């Protein structure tokens, strides 16, 4: 395979990515790009980033053999990359630390963020507290309802949480509001985007901060499993946890990459969030990618039991990986993800986030069809405490 060097200088992954924003944001993006291109090569910045990941986040996160579950399934060996063990409970904090350090380097005292499941909001509020920054988090009011405990966590950390009432009142609407705030307060504000979407340099910047996940796996799997995996499986909403584990494996051609989208109530139901499976190429939130849209190009409302996958677009690098055939993308329904959540709790004593449960469900589906010496590595991107209410509600339990 020829060396992988995307995006190009204009931020394109083939036809995807780029910069599609209002003129008022061009200067801010140019400034951000210059700062990032300086910092990513600056030994002092890299040293500080790595120090924070070790001492504040608790990295490296381990890889773990789900031996009992693998035995029960009677096929491939399932391994988990335990991002749920990070401080704040998910992969999101890796990227937030990187961007907060960048904000500090640029002299921006105020950070803003959008959040769906609340994990990125919590991670942003956490690093803002750590570095003494003002923090405002935009969150769809539907997600505020679904993720009440994370909303309270953000407030405890000193952040202002702004519920967004427009549209479907979910992640895309929160992103729209955050963009508006950024345009208005560009001089003193840094926008910490939580996923590998948005205008360049965000998709590559977020990817780069998250590749610590896959880089650790490259070292850990030979030590703990004896070799690299045959399959790497990760859930895809915007796609940052998946890019973080996929990117270092792209040159390893014998490792198959499988992204798992939210098929909701089924792809035929129209109630899902599988942009790569069912979307068309369009422009959303500053970049060209696959978007869930109707015949008139209007963004469609999405659905997933998991707030973090409930997004009508996907990172442009995933769009490129799909078209190039380097990664394959599949859908897992709400019911399949919930079943995997319950089984993971019962069999392995690990409570995964509903986002991660989609990836686990795919691994569980694949394992019995594969030989016993096959290795499937799943990015267990976060823990499931935040999803207690959703899971209990689905089971008809009130608390």
Swiss-Prot record:
It catalyses: (1S,2R)-1-C-(indol-3-yl)glycerol 3-phosphate + L-serine = D-glyceraldehyde 3-phosphate + L-tryptophan + H2O. GO terms for cellular component: cytoplasm. Its cofactor is pyridoxal 5'-phosphate. GO terms for molecular function: tryptophan synthase activity. Gene3D superfamilies: 3.40.50.1100. Keywords: Amino-acid biosynthesis, Aromatic amino acid biosynthesis, Lyase, Pyridoxal phosphate, Tryptophan biosynthesis. It is an enzyme of class 4 (lyase). Pfam families: PALP (PF00291). It comes from the Bacteria. The keyword Transmembrane helix does not apply. Its EC number is 4.2.1.20. Coiled coil: none annotated. InterPro entries: Trp_synth_b_CS, Trp_synth_beta, Trp_synth_beta/beta-like, TrpB-like_PALP, TrpB-like_PALP_sf. Belongs to the TrpB family. Tetramer of two alpha and two beta chains. This is Tryptophan synthase beta chain. It comes from Bordetella petrii (strain ATCC BAA-461 / DSM 12804 / CCUG 43448).
